[in-house]
Amino acid sequence: MTDTTAAPPAAPEDGAPGETGIRIIAQFVRDFSFESPHAPDSLRAGGAPPAIDMGVEMNARGRPDGLFEVDLKLSARATRDEQPVFHVEVLYGGLFHIAGVPEGDLEPVLLIECPRFLFPYARRLISDVTTEGGFPPFLIDPIDFAGVYAARKAQAEGVVVGNA
């Protein structure tokens, strides 16, 4: 029995024929804020848990170099008895190389698949900052980016979808 390892396949060069897929070139925090206007009083134990209003936005734009910038904005506003407890907002960006995707399929890739890559990192930032702010970790449930995309698309076309 031998311990041999096969060499990993060579990565295709940019623009190589037949190349398909999404490649993350960079990811970064574009903007980040946390407010706890009534601390330390808002940190008191007991009372009703805060009501949390979540917001999700996705945007994408092409760049002259052929890459795409995708932004995922997550915001959470917590209130208790109509008083603000905390407000956190992160605008997390990614720079993507996308190859082999037909023009008609590009928008869903940019606004569904790319945010799926960015979400875990933006979610962790929010969890970490709420913990550092003295609150229990705020873990955002997984987001159905395809559902958000479909609802926004329908809304833009004037179709009523649920309570969107």
Curated annotation (Swiss-Prot):
Keywords: Chaperone, Cytoplasm, Protein transport, Translocation, Transport
GO-annotated biological processes: protein folding; protein tetramerization; protein transport
Subcellular location(s) per record: Cytoplasm
Entry GO terms, CC: cytoplasm
Protein's UniProt keywords contain Transferase: no
Pfam annotation, one family: SecB
Sequence similarity: Belongs to the SecB family.
Quaternary structure (record): Homotetramer, a dimer of dimers. One homotetramer interacts with 1 SecA dimer.
Protein name in UniProt: Protein-export protein SecB
Source species of the chain: Caulobacter sp. (strain K31)
Underlying gene: secB
